[in-house]
Amino acid sequence: MIATLLSSLLLTGPISAGAETQGLLPAQDLLPDIGTSAGATLSIDQEMAMGDFYVRQMRASAPLIYDPLLTQYINTLGNRLVANANSVRTPFHFYLVNNDQINAFAFFGGNVVLHSALFRYTDNESELASVLAHEISHVTQRHLARAMEEQQRLAPLTWVGVLGSILLTMASPQAGMAGLSGTLAGAQQGIISFTQGNEQEADRIGIQVLQRSGFDPQAMPNFLQKLADQSRYVSKPPEMLLTHPLPDSRLSDARNRANQMKPHPTASSQDYLFAKMRILGMYGADENSLTPELLDKLSKGTVREQLAAKYGQAVQLYQAKKYDEARNLLQPLLAQQPGNIWFLDLMTDIDLGQNKSAAAIARLQNAMVKQNDEPVLQLNLANAYVQGRQPAAAIKLLHRYTFAYPNDPNGWDLLAQATATQGLRDQELAARAESLALSGKLTQAIGLLSDASARVKLGSLEQARYDARIDQLRRLNERFRKYQKS
């Protein structure tokens, strides 16, 4: 039932003409581009604005993982798929929620959310990519906007209530489903039918996106089969089947379409294996996910898997605060790959865990000679500067980082720490305000910026900048209030 609502779609207008016909499927199986069919309900600008609103609400209420390495990985993977999709009119943003239930969804503004459990239950990168391709296809086909049109035909609906229930579902699936059911009321059956059609449509288009992006198209039916098998042996089906209906026809259709494509077995990237190790070792309720059996299996596998096993062992040792053992395991890996950001990030954490900020700073500065624009290294170095009591250096680097990545709370939080250490109260307040604004706490953010403005010289450039930002946030707050009332 949620699947239609859980998926946003704002995109239209093909990226490249003829991309759908490049030997992917027989002509009769190709799907028409229907991305513009929902234009009567919401414009792209309106969807973008609503997406911004709900992303901010999500930051405030959902257990998002703000891990720079994982954020960079899922956005790189996601945008690789987006580059091979049609009807893309907005940027895409991918988020990771710390949730042990298998699920993913998309909503307004090209925003796609993955549960961390997907890394636990996917056997390879193609399976993970198949989930992303499915959600991206929901977006490019504008299924959420089309669902709104369908709902308007069936019965009035408060869409803020629906999307609010979606966000609640991330933290508490049962409560979210209950809230959604109450909102949908008597129109449920029509929406359910519409949803099942959307799911199959997203599968069909997603398989094409998957293949064009260089992944194995069989990964989609394989993962769907895995979900179906799991539901047969447990009393409660996987959460993903509650939000993404899986009738037999959907599974058989996905398998048939994948079988029509040229086989394309694809090895998982090193980054996928590292990300899997990191999530198993650092996130989720199960502290025993990085089992000796799994690490032993990987250590006997391919070269990439062997390297992932060593990284996983180092993560495990770091989490147990066995810093010397973790360092001894990681040091040879760094010697072989001195620019590897996964190794550099973990070694920085080990250094800071042992109060060796000077060593971390020296290593990161050396790495940034060749990777000056690498955001993961910038954040690591800024954090090392803060921990090493070099706030001036941190502030300089973080001004650059927050300018390039204004929607990352990590940068603003570190900047607030650094400016506080320097006694720059107005700048600290402004940085804290930006972090609050990203979580939708606009009234509080405006209050902090007003305080910052009052602390600087009357008529100064700093005051003009703070006041201009206050005006922006006030306008944004007024717009968001309309969404909350609608």
Swiss-Prot record:
Q: How is the cofactor bound?
A: Binds 1 zinc ion per subunit.
The answer to whether keyword Metal-binding applies is yes
EC? 3.4.-.-
Q: Which UniProt keywords apply?
A: Hydrolase, Metal-binding, Metalloprotease, Periplasm, Protease, Signal, Zinc
Q: This protein is called what?
A: Beta-barrel assembly-enhancing protease
GO MF annotation terms = metalloendopeptidase activity; zinc ion binding
Residues recorded as binding Zn(2+), renumbered to this chain, are 134, 138, 199
Recorded family membership: Belongs to the peptidase M48 family. BepA subfamily.
- Name of the gene: bepA
Q: Which N-terminal residues, if any, form the signal peptide?
A: 1-19
Q: Where in the cell is it found?
A: Periplasm
Q: Where are the transmembrane segments?
A: none
User: Which source organism?
Assistant: Yersinia pestis
Q: Required co-factor?
A: Zn(2+)
Q: Which HAMAP family match?
A: Protease_BepA
